[in-house]
UniProtKB/Swiss-Prot annotation:
GO terms for biological process: maturation of SSU-rRNA. GO terms for molecular function: ribosomal small subunit binding. Belongs to the RbfA family. This is Ribosome-binding factor A. It holds the Pfam family RBFA. It comes from Staphylococcus epidermidis (strain ATCC 35984 / DSM 28319 / BCRC 17069 / CCUG 31568 / BM 3577 / RP62A). InterPro entries: KH_dom-like_a/b, RbfA, RbfA_dom_sf, Ribosome-bd_factorA_CS. GO terms for cellular component: cytosol. It is found in: Cytoplasm. One of several proteins that assist in the late maturation steps of the functional core of the 30S ribosomal subunit. Associates with free 30S ribosomal subunits (but not with 30S subunits that are part of 70S ribosomes or polysomes). Required for efficient processing of 16S rRNA. May interact with the 5'-terminal helix region of 16S rRNA. Its main location: cytoplasm. Signal peptide: none annotated. The gene is rbfA.
Length: 116
């Protein structure tokens, strides 16, 4: 039962954090990013926010520094938007699955091109 609630809250947090980052965080270091997933512990005390950033390594690094600095602001905004007793501690992590999927896709295309 708790697991289903954690998934529902995670989906809502994903939408709210995207809105906060896009519309409220004014740090110019925040690049174009997409939140791919939010994983919550069953007690909703910690949340891992997985995201991808469009850009080179320096832009990715700058975006993570800006998000780390804005974590308190994002938490306070979440507190006013969501009805939770305790707002989870946020941890931002880079989601490499998109890059990995693109790499696999390129390899498959190369194999098909070599077969012809």
């Amino acid at each position: 039962m708790n697991n289903i609630r954690a998934e529902r809250v995670g989906e809502q947090m994903k939408q709210e954090i995207m809105d906060i980052v896009n519309n409220k965080v004014k740090d110019p270091r925040v690049g174009f990013l997409t939140i791919t997933d939010v994983e919550l512990t069953n007690d909703l005390s910690q949340a891992k926010v997985y995201l991808t950033v469009l850009g080179n390594d320096k832009e990715v690094d700058n975006t993570f520094k800006a998000l780390h600095k804005a974590t308190g602001f994002i938490k306070s905004e979440l507190g006013s938007r969501m009805r939770l007793r305790i707002i989870p501690e946020l941890t931002f992590e880079y989601d490499e699955s998109i890059e990995y999927g693109n790499k696999i896709e390129r390899m498959i295309q190369e194999l098909h091109k070599n077969d012809k």
